[in-house]
Amino acid sequence: SRFECERISKALQIPADRITAIYNGYSTHFTPLPEVNMHIVQQYIPEKGFLFFLGNTDPKKNTERVLKAYSLYLQRSATKRPLLIADLKEEYIDRVLQQEGIADIKRHLYYPGYIPNSHLATLYNASFAFLYPSLRESFGIPLLEAMACGTPVVTGNTSAMPEVAGSGALTVDPSKPEEIADRLLQLEQNPTLYQEQKAYGLQRAQQFSWARTAGELSKVYQSIKI
């Protein structure tokens, strides 16, 4: 990302014009599915239409604020969609819930632990929205995966995330749980906005591919004078 190029330039004192940003792509199986395989979905959560979050214990993933935001969402939502959390253990989630004083939301959470990559496209398609409000990302391939599936995305307005997402995602200040909750409620309460974000995400994802990555990398190699 250009964000990382700037960081490298400053940290290593390399002229910016000597660094080229070449964007990642995503696997082509991330695409809108004509029909969601409920057998896969129900391995993790009973019904589709849930909120989806790929978490881990790295502080930059912002798990504490995501759960706080979800608590705020539940207080104001008529639908109260469940939250599916990938790649986090129950002990960690319990600790965060106790720390934030929101243990009462646990009944709305599903946390199956590891979810294989082969199931992610189905889960993106089955979800109502994807949460990716990290504090920092060098790129953010899950953004592309979700957008490519036609899933509305809520992401952070910091580091490389707005650069990657463009208009294909709703951005928030990731340090403010109330903003994350507001965006979820906007998607839920405004059908026009929801459909627009699905379309914008699909359009944005089409600008990225591994073939394009390879082509741009090849151009850089060919431009090097030995």
Which role fits each region the language model picked out?
Residues 1-226:
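Carbohydrate transferase catalytic cores enriched for Leloir-type hexosyltransferases
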